[in-house]
Every structure is written in structure tokens, then in C-alpha cells.
Curated annotation (Swiss-Prot):
Its EC number is 2.1.2.1. Belongs to the SHMT family. Catalyzes the reversible interconversion of serine and glycine with tetrahydrofolate (THF) serving as the one-carbon carrier. This reaction serves as the major source of one-carbon groups required for the biosynthesis of purines, thymidylate, methionine, and other important biomolecules. Also exhibits THF-independent aldolase activity toward beta-hydroxyamino acids, producing glycine and aldehydes, via a retro-aldol mechanism. It comes from Vibrio parahaemolyticus serotype O3:K6 (strain RIMD 2210633). The record marks 228 as: Plays an important role in substrate specificity. It catalyses: (6R)-5,10-methylene-5,6,7,8-tetrahydrofolate + glycine + H2O = (6S)-5,6,7,8-tetrahydrofolate + L-serine. Keywords: Amino-acid biosynthesis, Cytoplasm, One-carbon metabolism, Pyridoxal phosphate, Transferase. InterPro entries: PyrdxlP-dep_Trfase, PyrdxlP-dep_Trfase_major, PyrdxlP-dep_Trfase_small, Ser_HO-MeTrfase, Ser_HO-MeTrfase-like, Ser_HO-MeTrfase_PLP_BS, SHMT-like_dom. This is Serine hydroxymethyltransferase 1. The keyword Zinc does not apply. One of its GO terms (biological process) is glycine biosynthetic process from serine.
């Protein structure tokens, strides 16, 4: 018999200490990594539920094991809510991650060696969009497209590459692009060469759900996303489509049994909660503030003489190009981290430095907005960051900035 008062603190002091330390770090550090966010206690309650005990290979109503009648209800709720939230006929909520969702799309629609057109990682794409170190770059013939000198996706170049190479699939989406993507134009290009349009909207799914960023769903054959990031749910993946039953069968088979076995029912329950939360008015207001805060920070960085890739942002993130400042992304990351400001070093277009050093940092506002930062707070934060970057290695500036960070974190806790 398992007693409900069993806990980690009394049993595993080392692990409990690590959890407590991470909890404190999240409260006392400003989180600016664009792919990170804080999920709600309701989502965490679902993830800590007894649904974790149930094996449920297959899909609702078509399981390989018995006793799935209640987890079927939970998964169907997640499916129905995802379809309603994003306006689609089909949703698969089982992928354990965004990368596994993307892998399933490749498996469903392509054969090894097929040609794919994807955004270059160096220009803002993602590992799973054809990077040579990833399965997508190893198993498929990848033709990269990028951005022009103004920092915008070059659709004319994309069309020329498509006409020349005749890809079977064109991939839209990004991990470090701050502008609006023209999904309609991408579909037109795909149709000219009879290619699938596959969009990975992981970074902007929350903005799309709230109407703050154009949706790719009416244009793409298949759309994937993570369920964390701007969507603020549990860590996991999601596949969406409106392309018909044949497509849905291929996608389902590619997830199970093609790439995964048993789904994580406790995480799927967390997704169901997050999708319901994303339909609330306060979620829409939150996403609007995410964009406003990003724009406020960009304006302040520019006022202080820092170059922003694409000269601004239309979503939740932006890249600060530090080449002219002769600061590496690695050094900027470390200095800001010492002031309790968490960012990630990031390559910028035509970066002369390696991906392990880089010449830029990526900044995102979902997490700070989640804890209540206003536009004025965002401007103050950008100024503090500029103070640190203007004085790289100055311990007094770093310490003074850290104290400001601790004060605002105390005023705006993540979990009150």
C-alpha cells in the first residue's frame, strides 16, 4: 500500500534540495529565454496525477490495453480543445516533444533522401528544419533558405530555390525570427512545385491562439507546435491539420506505432488544461502584453545604440547583434547571468563566430510578462541589460543590477 503522505523531502534530501534550489532560481532570476515560460499550478496538478500510472497505446476508443475508458476522456478533451483553439479538424496530442512531432511529420510525408526546403539554422530556423547535426539533415536532402540584408525572409529566393530543386516539402517556422511570416505566400510557392507546406509554429503558438500573430492553419498541410513556450502548457508536442482523412491516418501512424509507444497520459491531461486556459480572455490579454513588452525592450536597446536583427520585432522575441560592440554572445550571456538575468547566446546572420561563442543574444518576453512585467518594467530591464553590456566585466555594475533584479522579482513573484 502506498501512503499519500509519502514525500521527497523526507526520503531524498539531495533531490529535494535541487528542486528547492531551482524553485528559488526561477523566483529570483529574470527569465528571458524565448522558449521558456511558467506553467500554471493547474497544469502541474494534472502532471502530478495518477494518470501517470496508465499505459494507453493507441488512440481514444482504439487502445491495445484495457482500462483506458477514463484516460480516453482526458485525451479526447485535449484533442477537442486543441481543434477548437486553433480552428482545425485534426489534432494529435501524443507527441512527447516538438521535435518528435516534427519527426512524425517527416515520417508520414517523406521518404529518406527526399528534398526539403527549410530555414537555415544560422538565419533563425530550428535544428529539426534540416540542420546537418539533426535527423532532418542526415536523412533528407535539405536546401536552406534565409533572410535578406534587411532581416526579412526572402520569398523570391525561396521561390527560386523551390523551382530549381523541386522539394517534396517546404518548412515554415523558426526559433529566432522576429517578423511576421507570410504563410499564404509560402503555400503559393509550395503549390507551384506540388510540395507539402509544413509549418512549425512552436514559438508563436500562444500568440496565434490569441490572435496576436497570423495563423498558418488555413494555409499549411500540417502544423506542429510545442505546448510550452508561448502556449504556457506542459512540455510536449502537438500536430494539427485540415488536410483530410488520408493525411490524418498517416500522421497518427507516424506517431504511434511509428515513433512512440505509450503516450504520457498525465502530460496529455496537462495539455488539456493549458488549451482550456488559452481560450480564456485573460490569456488573450497576456499575449498582447507579451508583444508590447518585446517592442518596448527593442526600443530601449535601440535607443542605447544596440543593433536589433530585422530592426525590430512583431512577436515575443528579438536578437541583439553584438558584432559592432565587439562582445561575444557567450560573454554577454555570462555577464547578464551573473546579474540574475537569464538569456541565451545566439548566432546572428553572417556570424563570424562559432555557435558555441556567437555574436548575439536572443531575448524573449513570455516569462517576464507571465509574472506581471509592464511595458515600463520591460524598458527598465532593457536599460539594466545595456548597463551590464556597456560595462562587461564590471563587478560593481553587475552587482548593482542584480539588486535591482532581486527587488523586482520580489515585487512580481512567479507563484504568489
Amino acid at each position: 500500500m502506498l501512503k499519500r503522505d509519502m514525500n521527497i523531502a523526507d526520503y531524498d534530501a539531495e533531490l529535494f534540495a535541487a528542486i528547492q534550489e531551482e524553485t528559488l532560481r526561477q523566483e529570483e532570476h529574470i527569465e528571458l529565454i524565448a522558449s521558456e515560460n511558467y506553467t500554471s499550478p493547474r497544469v502541474m496538478e494534472a502532471q502530478g496525477s495518477q494518470l501517470t500510472n496508465k499505459y494507453a497505446e493507441g488512440y481514444p476508443g482504439k487502445r491495445y490495453y484495457g482500462g483506458c475508458e477514463y484516460v480516453d476522456k482526458a485525451e479526447q478533451l485535449a484533442i477537442d480543445r486543441a481543434c477548437k483553439l486553433f480552428g482545425c479538424e485534426y489534432a494529435n496530442v501524443q507527441p512527447h516533444s516538438g521535435s518528435q512531432a516534427n519527426s512524425a511529420v517527416y515520417m508520414a510525408l517523406l521518404n529518406p533522401g527526399d528534398t526539403v526546403l527549410g530555414m537555415s539554422l544560422a538565419h533563425g530556423g530550428h535544428l529539426t528544419h534540416g540542420s546537418p547535426v539533426n535527423f532532418s539533415g542526415k536523412h533528407y536532402n535539405v536546401i536552406p533558405y534565409g533572410i535578406d540584408e534587411a532581416g526579412q525572409i526572402n520569398y523570391d529566393e525561396m521561390e527560386q530555390l523551390a523551382l530549381e530543386h523541386k522539394p517534396k516539402m517546404i518548412i515554415g517556422g523558426f526559433s529566432a525570427y522576429s517578423q511576421i511570416v507570410d504563410w499564404k505566400r509560402m503555400r503559393e510557392i509550395a503549390d507551384k512545385v506540388d510540395a507539402y507546406l509544413f509549418v512549425d509554429m512552436a514559438h508563436v503558438a500562444g500568440l496565434i491562439a490569441a490572435g496576436e500573430y497570423p495563423t498558418p492553419v488555413p494555409h499549411a498541410h500540417v502544423v506542429t507546435t510545442t505546448t510550452h513556450k508561448t502556449l504556457a502548457g506542459p512540455r510536449g508536442g502537438l500536430i494539427l491539420s485540415n488536410a483530410g482523412e488520408d493525411m490524418y491516418k498517416k500522421l497518427n501512424s507516424a506517431v504511434f506505432p511509428g515513433g512512440q509507444g505509450g503516450p504520457l497520459m498525465h502530460v496529455i491531461a496537462g495539455k488539456a488544461v493549458a488549451f482550456k486556459e488559452a481560450m480564456e480572455p485573460e490569456f488573450k490579454a497576456y499575449q498582447a502584453r507579451v508583444v508590447k513588452n518585446a517592442k518596448a525592450m527593442v526600443g530601449q536597446f535601440q535607443e542605447r545604440g544596440y543593433k536589433i536583427v530585422s530592426n525590430g520585432t512583431e512577436n515575443h522575441l528579438f536578437l541583439v547583434d553584438l558584432i559592432d560592440k565587439d562582445i561575444t554572445g557567450k560573454d554577454a550571456d555570462a555577464a547578464l547571468g551573473a546579474a540574475n538575468i537569464t538569456v541565451n547566446k545566439n548566432s546572428v546572420p553572417n556570424d563570424p563566430r562559432s555557435p558555441f561563442v556567437t555574436s548575439g543574444i536572443r531575448v524573449g518576453t513570455p516569462a517576464i510578462t507571465r509574472r506581471g512585467f509592464t511595458e515600463e518594467d520591460a524598458k527598465d530591464l532593457a536599460n539594466w541589460m545595456c548597463d551590464v553590456l556597456d560595462n562587461i566585466g564590471n563587478e560593481e555594475v553587475i552587482e548593482a543590477t542584480k539588486q535591482k533584479v532581486l527587488e523586482i522579482c520580489k515585487r512580481l513573484p512567479v507563484y504568489a
